[in-house]
Amino acid sequence: MGYEAIITINCEYYSNRIIDVIMLLSKLNWSFYNSDGLVEYIPIGDNDECDWQREKISEADLKDIVDYKQDHNERVGLLFCYNGTEGGFTMTASSTKEIVLGLDYYRKTMPDNTTDFSWYFQNVIVLLRNNGCEIDYLTFDEYTD
C-alpha cells in the first residue's frame, strides 16, 4: 500500500511573498539545492503541467523566477532537502495563504510505513515559528492508494 502525505500551511501573516518563506527555510537547514547542486523547480510558463526541471540556478535567479511566477499568478514549485539527511519535500504555492508541502522526497516514516509527521513538525513547523513565521493554520494529511 502506498502513501501520499502533505502539510498545508498559511504563512500570510509572516509575508505575502513566497520568496520570503523560501529564504527563511533556506536559513533553517533546508536547501533548495539537491545533492548534485541543482535546483528542482517548476519553470516559468508551465501552465500547471508540473513539468519539474533540474538546473544549476543562482539564488538571485531563483528569486527572480519565484517573484515573476507569483506576480503572474503561476504556481511556484520547489524541492527542499534537509541538510545532512535524506529528508525533504516539494513546496507548491500560488500565494503564502496556501503553501502545500508534498512529503514525497525521502518521506520520513514510522515502523508501519505511515508518515512520521512529528519529524516534519519539529524540522519545518517549529523552526518556522521559532524564527518569526506566524502560521495561521496548518493541516497534516495522509492518503493511501
Locate the predicted segments by residue:
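Acidic, proline/glycine-rich low-complexity IDRs
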Residues: 1-4, 99-145
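Short, extreme N-terminal segment that most often corresponds to the first beta-strand
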Residues: 1-45
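Generic structural motif
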Residues: 10-14, 83-85, 96, 106-108
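Intrinsic-disorder-associated interaction segments
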Residues: 11-14, 55, 69, 110-117
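Generic alpha-helix signal with a bias toward terminal, lower-confidence helices
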Residues: 19-21, 37, 42-44, 64, ...
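Hydrophobic, Leu/Ile/Phe/Ala-enriched alpha-helical segments that form helix-helix packing faces
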Residues: 21-29, 69, 121-128, 132
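Short, intrinsically disordered low-complexity segments
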Residues: 30-97
